Amino acid sequence: MKRILITNDDGFESLGLRALIEALRDIAQLTIVVPANEKSACGHSLTLTKPLRFVEIEDNFYKLEDGTPTDCVYLALSSLYPDGEKPDIIVSGINRGANMGEDITYSGTVAGAMEGAIYDIPSIAISQVCNSNCEETEMEVGYEQAKYVARDLVEKIFQQGWPAGHRRCLNVNVPPTKEFKGYKITRAGYRVYFNQAHLHRNPRGIEYWWLGLHPLDWIPGKERDCDFEAVKEGFVSITPIKADLTAYEEIPKLKSWL
């Protein structure tokens, strides 16, 4: 039987995780290793300054105390699989909220898949895009389309093989609709950012900050092939990504500059 390693960044109690387990539980042997607490926007961070501890919730379902999604995949591959063995696929998600454009560099969900890609394991990050409010999206839309997409893509990989190259993963974003309109293969778009740091003071006058979430806005391109545009049009966006961040097009200019 095929084996799937599941992780996320929303924690072990998230609705998206439960939906993903329901979607995949009868087509593969699942091992679930997720953070004990929400780790949204933790990026590809690996814990090096304190010990980590598995807590088994159910058979093959673990939460990792103080762990990140990267920790979860790293430790699962190190300790839960016999020597030389690997899962057939790693699936990270289903994330509550979008992971598009440059936001993928912040995303713990994407990092979980990227950690798998580093080990050359087929890996997918799946995110449920929200309307203006994620709680309302969960209530009104739910995760039914995301469940369908997760299962469909995993079955395609099992039947047809991995469609991307070595050390690549797929970043999948599902629009906030109930009906499946289809897939679009996309590039990562360019996000619009602005400062959302809010200063507060506690009753003792000590200052502290909350970092706010940016509204989902992007820079329109000449070609309508980015993840933002696909999701806006109601399609599931699939973006192939890799850990290699080299800007190859800049190398000749830098050589001449020196």
UniProtKB/Swiss-Prot annotation:
EC number: 3.1.3.5
Species of origin: Nitratiruptor sp. (strain SB155-2)
Cofactor note: Binds 1 divalent metal cation per subunit.
PANTHER family: 5'-NUCLEOTIDASE SURE, 5'_3'-NUCLEOTIDASE SURE
Catalytic activity entry: a ribonucleoside 5'-phosphate + H2O = a ribonucleoside + phosphate
GO MF annotation list: 3'-nucleotidase activity; 5'-nucleotidase activity; exopolyphosphatase activity; metal ion binding; nucleotide binding
Gene Ontology CC terms: cytoplasm
EC top class, as a word: hydrolase
Main location: cytoplasm
HAMAP family: SurE
Domain of life of the organism encoding this protein: Bacteria
Keywords, in A-Z order: Cytoplasm, Hydrolase, Metal-binding, Nucleotide-binding
Protein name per UniProt: 5'-nucleotidase SurE
Pfam families: SurE
General function of this protein: Nucleotidase that shows phosphatase activity on nucleoside 5'-monophosphates.
Keyword Nucleus: no
Subcellular localization(s) per the UniProt record: Cytoplasm
Cofactor: a divalent metal cation
Family named by the database record: Belongs to the SurE nucleotidase family.
The gene coding this protein: surE
Annotated residues for binding of a divalent metal cation: D9, D10, S40, N95
